[in-house]
Amino acid sequence: SHACEGRDLSDEQETIDEVQTLPLDSWHRRKGARMLPFAGYEMPIQYESIVVEHNWTRDQAGLFDVSHMGQLMVTGENAAEELEKLLPGAIASLKPGRTRYSLLMAESGGILDDLMVTNATPWIEGDEEEGTEGYWGDPAYYLVVNGAMKWDDIAHLREHLDDDVTLTHLEDRALLALQGPNAATALNRVMRNVIDDMVFMDSVVYDFGEWPLRITRSGYTGEDGFEISVPAEFAESLADRLCAEIEVRPIGLGARDSLRLEAGLPLYGHDITEEIDPVSADLGFALTKKRREQGGWIGHEAVSTVLANGPAQKRVG
């Protein structure tokens, strides 16, 4: 594939040039979506109009299908240490059920992708009758990477992660983002008491009937919101349940982009590329102080030089 010259992507990457369909493809079409290819998938660009959808999300709650994004799980005793070789953020100190924004770094100090990392280490319940205590299971980290970059990211992770760490691509899961000031109200009505104690960047697993969900309080619109990972086979039913709430309407990729821009959030491939280091991209917050000093991650030397001399240019806005 021209997109990743010289990288062996094994058999995982079927023909990348073929445009794929999302699990919710026919659902979007029934809702009147205008579909266009983006990041290798037919994506809903708009339903009614970008302006109407943008404003609805700012006032109410919008449902976005972001299933094109890559959902990955990294597991193993040394998972945190291994990820810290590739990401400049503090992963080892990330508590179970917490999420952090981070960057996948190139040796040049450029950014291969930006991503969300959640400590997904499971809590194993004890058994009162048997007198056994609950305990934390094997370390696990849930990663959400950009759709356009996911095959490159998977190849990069496979290349650099140690053999005793397992990387699983959760290809059978869809991802829905419910965003807007009334997102919590609507979600609470659908799933009572699940999100009551959740603060920004909290992540929980929850069995909604027979659907095993992962719900993270985050998003990319500048509004309060939740990203819900759901097995693809149940995605349509979940989308219907959410859109049955009066506050919720489906929102296309066009409004997702205008909301992101208005909130000043960077988009990989536009504001962030492999040619731009985190300091110039104004993402210095993703480099924790301790890890800046410690080093030991890909791209550290190049980034240290920029930190010492100041960036040549800086993203603003």
Task: Annotate the PLM regions.
Residues 77-113, 183-211:
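Internal amphipathic helical hairpin motif
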Residues 4-37, 44-45, 120-317:
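Conserved, structured C-terminal
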Residues 2-102, 110, 121:
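Acidic, proline/glycine-enriched N-terminal capping motif
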Residues 116-117:
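Glycine-rich, Trp-frequent "lid" loop and neighboring beta-strands that shape
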Residues 70, 74, 112, 141-148:
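Short coil/turn segments at secondary-structure boundaries
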